[in-house]
């Protein structure tokens, strides 16, 4: 659920990038890569309508080139793209040089494929073959290949000591085992990897979150894309931190802990953290999908709030606990609804990320398993129906500010949940997840990451 990748979008950048990698793998397995002389890519639906603003075409080129979004140096991205565009050649899988004109070989088709709003088809041609494969980017960087039967729910559940599809099941396990939500999730993770691997991966995710927040707080200027959006995290951070010297993200955190913090400063710090992450995301920087790139700022902002303000003695164990709970709550939404704005609007992104952060924070504040899920429910309840209408198809307006609002709501939801007797709660998390999905299905496609309605129409690119 929490994955390291490159911005600006998990569904429109990371997903297509991963699809291109999967296509390369197929070509290698069929021993066709070295015989390929041409590759054609068709983008459909939302990938086509907002693909330019979301850098879908660039992601496809980078994926076909063999670059890994987790590890490729960010500074090399422009070099790779410029070389392909200027030379009209692409080194397929970093092995086979082919002719490739992005304007001709990547086609934006406005029509939608039936399975999902984010479809893309790759076609490889050689002297004696023509191989085609279609993928769907279903949100959060996850992809599905057309025609491949996914593992059944029963097969998936069989792999875990505590199989979970619904919040009710999660609570039942907590009661049966006398464990916190994070402990139940940890036991499930242990069926997939060692304790050392779990710890190392969670810390890698945390350090990526910290690094991108640090970069965002120390980078000024204007975001790319034509909206001329000025970065704000830099100025907010400068006003908050004062005249202090530090030489690393960790020393920076220590400096923040020493600042004078009252209610207004809390609001500003949380907003600053979230803006910083999403400004990095909007400039094709490296972030953690949480659960998406467009909502990547909420969870780091709330976690940083906890370690710098709420509990300045927080340890790696607290961070691990937070991420485990957040990931499980996100998984519940993915299984019961969607984490794709192209399917459910922004409630599927900021709404889900706010619910994830609220539940995770609630456990760290001492909330019971019931209160953790109440926190997640409160956060989502107040995002239901939120539209996805990015101006110019860019993950900037209103996306960046929405992360700040989602983070503040998450903190408030956690505090409300702590003060709630679970016996008096009226809306179970499973009900709000189902309601979110019904709302998503009822929502007009204009408000599902197509830039055909809402702010995307009301505010002209020329006005910016």
Could you tell me what each predicted segment is?
Residues 1-5, 270-278, 322-330, 376-379, ...:
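Short alpha-helical scaffolding segments that buttress acidic/His motifs in well-ordered protein cores
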Residues 196-313, 317-345, 454-464:
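Accessory "access/gating" subregions that flank catalytic or transport cores
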Residues 313, 325, 331-404, 416-427:
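Hydrophobic alpha-helical bundle architecture
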Residues 239-242, 401-407, 413, 417-464:
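C-terminal auxiliary extensions adjacent to catalytic cores
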Residues 266, 291, 295, 318, ...:
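Secondary-structure capping and boundary motifs in well-ordered enzyme cores
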Residues 65-257:
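C-terminal regulatory domains involved in ligand/effector binding and gene-expression control
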Residues 11-28, 300-312, 358-366:
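Alpha-helical support elements that line or immediately flank enzyme active sites
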Residues 2-20, 283-302, 346-354:
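Conserved phosphate/anionic-ligand binding catalytic regions in large, soluble enzymes, centered on
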């Amino acid at each position: 659920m929490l994955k390291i990748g490159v911005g600006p979008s998990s569904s429109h950048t990371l997903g297509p990038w991963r699809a291109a990698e999967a296509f390369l793998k197929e070509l290698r397995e069929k021993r066709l890569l070295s015989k390929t002389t041409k590759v054609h890519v068709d983008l459909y639906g939302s990938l086509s309508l907002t693909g330019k603003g979301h850098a879908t075409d660039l992601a496809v080129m980078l994926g076909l080139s063999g670059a890994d979004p987790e590890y490729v140096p960010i500074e090399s991205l422009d070099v790779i793209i410029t070389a392909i565009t200027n030379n009209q050649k692409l080194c397929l899988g970093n092995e086979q040089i082919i002719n490739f004109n992005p304007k001709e070989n990547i086609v934006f088709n406005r029509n939608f494929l039936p399975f999902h709003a984010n479809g893309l088809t790759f076609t490889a041609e050689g002297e004696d073959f023509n191989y085609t494969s279609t993928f769907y980017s279903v949100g959060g960087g996850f992809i599905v290949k057309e025609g491949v039967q996914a593992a059944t729910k029963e097969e998936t559940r069989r792999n875990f000591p505590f199989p979970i599809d619904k919040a009710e099941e999660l609570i039942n396990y907590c009661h049966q085992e006398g464990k916190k939500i994070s402990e139940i999730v940890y036991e499930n993770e242990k069926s997939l990897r060692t304790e050392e691997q779990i710890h190392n991966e969670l810390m890698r995710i945390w350090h990526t979150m910290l690094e991108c927040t640090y970069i965002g707080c120390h980078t000024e200027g204007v975001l790319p894309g034509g909206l001329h959006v000025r970065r704000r995290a830099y100025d907010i951070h400068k006003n908050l931190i004062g005249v202090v010297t530090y030489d690393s993200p960790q020393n920076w955190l220590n400096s923040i802990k020493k600042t004078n913090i009252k209610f207004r400063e809390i609001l500003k710090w949380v907003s600053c953290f979230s803006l910083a992450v999403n400004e990095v995301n909007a400039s094709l920087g490296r972030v953690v999908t949480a659960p998406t790139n467009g909502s990547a700022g909420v969870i780091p902002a709330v976690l940083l709030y906890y370690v710098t303000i709420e509990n300045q003695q927080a340890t790696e164990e607290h961070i691990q606990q937070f991420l485990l709970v957040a990931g499980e709550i996100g998984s519940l939404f993915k299984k019961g609804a969607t984490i794709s704005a192209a399917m459910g609007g922004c409630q599927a992104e900021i709404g889900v990320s706010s619910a994830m952060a609220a539940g995770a924070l609630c456990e760290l504040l001492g909330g019971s398993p019931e209160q953790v899920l109440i926190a997640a429910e409160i956060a989502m309840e107040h995002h239901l129906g939120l539209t996805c209408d990015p101006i110019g198809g860019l993950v900037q307006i209103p996306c960046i500010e929405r992360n700040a609002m989602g983070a503040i709501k998450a903190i408030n939801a956690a505090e409300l949940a702590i003060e709630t007797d679970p016996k008096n709660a009226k809306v179970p998390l499973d009900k709000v997840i189902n309601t979110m999905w019904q709302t998503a299905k009822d929502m007009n496609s204009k408000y599902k990451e197509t830039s055909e309605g809402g702010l995307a129409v009301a505010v002209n690119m020329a006005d910016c």
